[in-house]
Amino acid sequence: MSRRSFLKSSSVAAAIPVMGTTGSVLAKENSPANTGITLDYPETAVGNVNQLPINKPVNFNYPDSGSPCAMIRMGQAVPGGMGPNKDIVAYSLLCNHMGCSLNYEPASRTFKCPCHFSIFDSEKAGQMVTGQATEDLPRILLSYSEDTGDIKAVGVSGLIFGRQANIL
């Protein structure tokens, strides 16, 4: 191999990793998280405060039919709670570790994953307590009408499992 051929080959080999990094930097700079773009979530009626039992989940899908969620009236004010007593919260029912369906345990007021045993605290904004998950549960943002008692899902805080963006 001549010196000239060696230098050409070396230059190309050295440039390949740099080109890959440049592409990922450009993609990151143009992602919605870095451009200040907010996603337009649908407003979806999910219940009425007068019909919500205390500490019993009411299931619904949000922001689309592929995303199961649960709304719970805790019976006491909690962080991020909505409604007249600031005690109504909603979360995605997909564990953010591997996407398994979560079960609500009324006695401990936690969501438990039957697949890998992650536990999330519903009274502490879906905080991950233990297990394989590394993030808190995505919170479903709610709005409440004082006039009618109607509750609507209006957004998501956190990324729903298996998605690059919550709105498909």
Locate predicted features.
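N-terminal pre-ligand scaffold of iron-sulfur
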Residues: K28-N96, C100-P106, S143-L168
